[in-house]
Swiss-Prot record:
Cellular compartment(s): Cytoplasm
Superkingdom of source: Bacteria
Alphabetically ordered keywords of this record: Cytoplasm, Methyltransferase, rRNA processing, S-adenosyl-L-methionine, Transferase
EC number: 2.1.1.177
CDD domains: RlmH-like
HAMAP family: 23SrRNA_methyltr_H
Name of the featured protein: Ribosomal RNA large subunit methyltransferase H
Protein species of origin: Bacillus pumilus (strain SAFR-032)
Cystine residue pairs: none
Amino acid sequence: MNISIITVGKLKEKYLKQGIAEYTKRLQAYAKIDIIELADEKAPEHLSEQDMKIIKDKEGERILSKINPDAHVIALAIEGKMKTSEELADTIDKLATYGKSKVCFVIGGSLGLSDAVMQRANEKLSFSRMTFPHQLMRLVLVEQVYRAFRIVRGEPYHK
């Protein structure tokens, strides 16, 4: 399976880079993983709704240009469906079973994802109703994808 993670914004914190590198290395035993980091739009502190939409649309165009047309797209969004680790594993297993070899997770920038990206998504996934820094979500997502593959293979993993 080919897993791509498209994310907006540059990862700055060393500890997050190290964690993501570790899980990416572990994932290579199960799938090809590609993390695509896109530039974010600079946004001043106080934005109008229209300015926020313009920024999300610009970031969205960059995201959409990187999505493989054959990919099953899972957008991370606060309004998405919450799943257990086992349910995420089941989703990945079913996609593989039904011939979807390309799965693309999308993490938006600080303002979220554009309407166009949300419409392109085959499903929306939420890890919580709380808001998290998009940089931290990269680490959480990579760990959960790794955990999902371990679950699918019946391999032990901490609960």
